[in-house]
């Protein structure tokens, strides 16, 4: 997983 994807997941609150 790329950091950018993890950031998006955290932003969505998933």
Swiss-Prot record:
The organism's place on the tree of life at top rank: Eukaryota
Location within or outside the cell: Secreted
GO terms of biological process kind: defense response to Gram-negative bacterium; killing of cells of another organism
Keywords: Amidation, Antibiotic, Antimicrobial, Secreted
Principal location: secreted
Distribution of this protein across tissues and organs: Expressed by the skin glands.
One GO CC annotation: extracellular region
Transmembrane feature ranges: none
Family per similarity comment: Belongs to the frog skin active peptide (FSAP) family. Hyposin subfamily.
Role noted for this protein: Antibacterial peptide active against X.axonopodis pv. glycines (MIC=42 uM). Not active against E.coli ATCC 25922, S.aureus ATCC 29313 or P.aeruginosa ATCC 27853.
Protein name per its UniProtKB record: Hyposin-H6
């Amino acid at each position: 997983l790329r950091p950018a994807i993890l950031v998006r997941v955290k932003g969505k609150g998933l």
